[in-house]
């Protein structure tokens, strides 16, 4: 809390957003050493004014990659920290609900790196319910056994990484819902659209250019949500996915903006959410 107060009070407002903090760790980045030095100088002056001391031996300056919180961060990418993958790599078949919850806790921290994580993990979450008996013995080939091995394989895939979001480029979000749950992908493109293109969202609609994935999200439907009509689930899926990506959307430059894609054509018409009960309150 002391770090947050100090930075909010003593850092210049135009560079406050350049600093990230978690517990007692601070990090910032720049494209040039000169710019990085100016940020470092501002931070030292900020801590001095706040009366906060830091240990010089713990300072890293001018490096191309750092470990921060649960991640390894570079200029372009963010990937899971190797120390966080060790418990998953060493995890054997769970023999109790406690062990299963520990496994899910480790993997949930990195769910944004995996497509459909929330839907794949649904059989495992079901086993953590009070009224659901834990399988003894653990049976191979069951839905929960397949889910356990799929998640473990996904998490330990060495190619897992996410692109760092560029707030000056347009953000794209693809949302979809199925019978099992909803999911979304936030991504950007490396190249700018052609000069004079007014609607980048329409221009990129059928683009075959490589996408730079910024984050994945997914979640299985609850028993109640599974009973809702398809139109309701599609609308609810979009709403909840946008809520999950709210921070990504709100940190976009005003000129860059964001575009949301859905394959549910009926909901794209004007007034499609009117006069449909609770859907009217979800109208965006």
Residue ranges and their predicted role:
Residues 1-2, 192-236, 264-268, 272-274:
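A short, polar/acidic, helix/strand-boundary loop motif
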Residues 1-40, 47, 113-117, 205-206, ...:
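Active-site palm subdomain of RNA-directed nucleic acid polymerases
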Residues 18-20, 25, 51-53, 58-60, ...:
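Beta-sheet entry/capping signal
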């Amino acid at each position: 809390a002391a770090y947050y107060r100090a930075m909010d009070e003593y850092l210049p407002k135009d560079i406050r957003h350049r600093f990230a903090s978690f517990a007692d760790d601070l990090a910032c980045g720049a494209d040039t050493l000169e710019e990085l030095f100016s940020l470092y100088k501002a931070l030292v002056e900020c801590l001095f004014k706040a009366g906060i001391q830091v240990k010089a031996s713990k300072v890293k300056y001018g490096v191309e990659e750092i470990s921060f919180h649960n991640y390894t961060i570079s200029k372009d990418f963010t990937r899971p920290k190797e120390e966080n993958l060790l418990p998953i790599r060493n995890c054997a078949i769970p023999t109790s609900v406690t062990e299963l919850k520990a496994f899910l806790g480790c993997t949930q921290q990195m769910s944004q790196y995996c497509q459909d994580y929330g839907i794949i993990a649904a059989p495992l979450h079901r086993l953590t319910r009070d009224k659901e008996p834990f399988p003894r013995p653990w049976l191979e080939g069951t839905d929960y056994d397949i889910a356990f091995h799929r998640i473990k394989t996904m998490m330990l895939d060495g190619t897992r990484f996410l692109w760092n979001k560029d707030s000056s480029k347009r953000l794209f979000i693809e949302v979809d819902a199925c019978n099992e749950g909803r999911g979304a992908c936030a991504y950007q493109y490396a190249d700018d659209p052609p000069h004079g293109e007014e609607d980048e969202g329409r221009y990129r609609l059928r683009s075959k250019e490589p996408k730079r994935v910024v984050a994945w999200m997914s979640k299985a439907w609850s028993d109640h949500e599974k009973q809702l009509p398809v139109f309701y689930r599609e609308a609810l899926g979009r709403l909840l996915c946008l809520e999950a990506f709210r921070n990504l959307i709100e940190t976009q430059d005003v000129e860059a903006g964001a575009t949301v894609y859905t394959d549910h054509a009926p909901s794209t018409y004007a007034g499609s959410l009117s006069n449909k009960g609770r859907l009217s309150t979800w109208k965006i």
